[in-house]
Amino acid sequence: MSRQKGCALFLVFAVTLASVPSAMAQRKRRAPSSGGGSDAPSGATSTKRSSKTSVDASLSSSGGGQPLDHGDKFYSQNNYFAATIEYAKVTDESGGDELSKQSAEFKMGKTLYKLKFYSAALSYFDRIVQKGASHPHYNETLQWLASLTREMPDSAGVLEKIGKYDRAELDNPQLQTVRDELYFLLGKFNYTKNKFKESVELFQMVSPKSPFYVQAKLFEGATYVREYNAKPAVDAFKEVLRVAEESSDPKIRPFQDLANLSLARVFYSTKQFVLATKYFDRVSPESYDWPNSLFESSWANFMLQQSGYSKALGNIHTLRAPFFEYFIKPESAAEALTVKATIFYYNCLFDRATDAIDEFMETVPSVKDGLVKVLKDNQDNAQFFDIAVKIRSGKSKLPPLVERAARAVLTDKSLAKRFEYVRELDKELASHDKADSAWKSTAVANNIFSDIGVNRALMVNEAGEMARKRVERLVDEFKQLHNRVIKIQFEILEGEKKQTEEDIRNETPKDRRVREKEYTVIKVDDEHQYWPFTGEYWRDELGYYRYRLKNKCGGKGGMPDQIATPDPAEGTPAPEDGATTPAGGEAPVPTENTQSDATTTP
């Protein structure tokens, strides 16, 4: 994605943030009150499947009590299949006691959750939410909805159900153990609806002691960015860094990396490029976003002109390593070549600029055409879902470069969760198929089967449509980059022409070589050593490459007006925090320049 989009790059993070592993937030809780017993939902539900005889016992039971009591008995025995039959007798009964029906609805939702029939459970909890506070289990349902958010993607509609509740309703004493989680989830819902004031208030209500505190602060910062309010965004992200610094929990690290990346993007958007490079450099090499942070850092260093060109080219060289084949965004890899060509052009190294353009033209247009064919051959959303599954598993039989590019845009966390949910629904269908035949013959089993099937069809359609849009967006990015490359090619030809005319008019090529200047100064401290790049990448050298760049323009070079440079996103100025040089700048490593030297870690 082009750095010309500035702040928009950050918004992608904001939307996908909830997909960061949140196992840290999955703790055991006291169950919602349901008339006795403790059966709180947890991150890992253990389902004990009933035997045929216990199901038959439910089917043959008559008299000796009410179905609701029978259901409670089976539930307490972990005989959830039999419990669903009894609760269904109450919910489906016409003209029965309304209070008993409402109780059975809630208990049916809990039971289906225990059976891991999450979509069916949600449909019963939705009945309760729609009835509002008049339903006796309205508040208790919130806890189970919170648990469902860990099992289902946002698109399943769980957040919308939580969004039906008022903030004041979260103060109910029954919700004490999950209140912070619900503040976070309700804030997240308001964020998706662009209700930024309400979402910030909710995020700020999450206790610093809560496992959801860090996520809430990240979303708070994202909300301020959406409002183009940089200073409080910076404060929120720095609070995440403070918590991470004081925590020994390794599960905090992904959030720390997101905070560093977000700070870098904010500072880039406010044209504080030195600060931007500082925070880009702090993203851990173990982070999923490290390759993309290297690319974005290249743009920030590019904006520093001569003081940043060496590192920008070094980062781009790093991204050419085979380690990043399936991690760098294909549009970023392609755009990196345009950055490389532009830097060489600005320094009158026209031959090398042309080489970078040639490399782009050798691969990108053909990959774009291959992706267009994939779109044309799979126009139905269900069809595209099927090809996307094959692409994600590396079994599409597409040309390798085409599959690699498509796979890169089909593995983002937001989309991946939808594919995972389809697999989860397939598991639910498989569990249904393996269930006791006596239970499968009941009306409740048929309703559950239909519910799962409908939800699967809807999710396949949604995932297929989203996957298609990802590929369409990539094709559009390639088209825009191709247009930029054509402009750069024209400027290179103009630059070569002017240089030749100047040589003829004023001096010989020999005199021009005398005027060449090398602006790159690579510093080596006691912990690093100078080492030339000889064509082989080493894992511990990635991210440290520097390029010894010469300027042949006879002056300082710079950024001519002919080629458009990226426009950072708008936003209020963020405060300086004292950094004057990019972090990691003292630890350079190899370069690809044939005349260059480099430093590398021991």
Give residue ranges: language-model regions.
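Extracytoplasmic/secretory-pathway proteins
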Residues: 27-64, 86-88, 116-120, 137, ...
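Short solvent-exposed coil/turn linkers within tandem alpha-helical repeat scaffolds
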Residues: 28, 58-59, 92-101, 128-140, ...
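Alpha-helical segment of the N-proximal tetratricopeptide repeat
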Residues: 62-89, 181-194, 269
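"A position-specific structural signal for the A-helix of alpha-solenoid helical repeats
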Residues: 69, 107, 144, 178-181, ...
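Structural motif corresponding to the intra-repeat A-B loop/turn of tetratricopeptide repeats
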Residues: 77, 115, 152, 193, ...
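TPR-repeat structural position
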Residues: 80, 118, 155, 196, ...
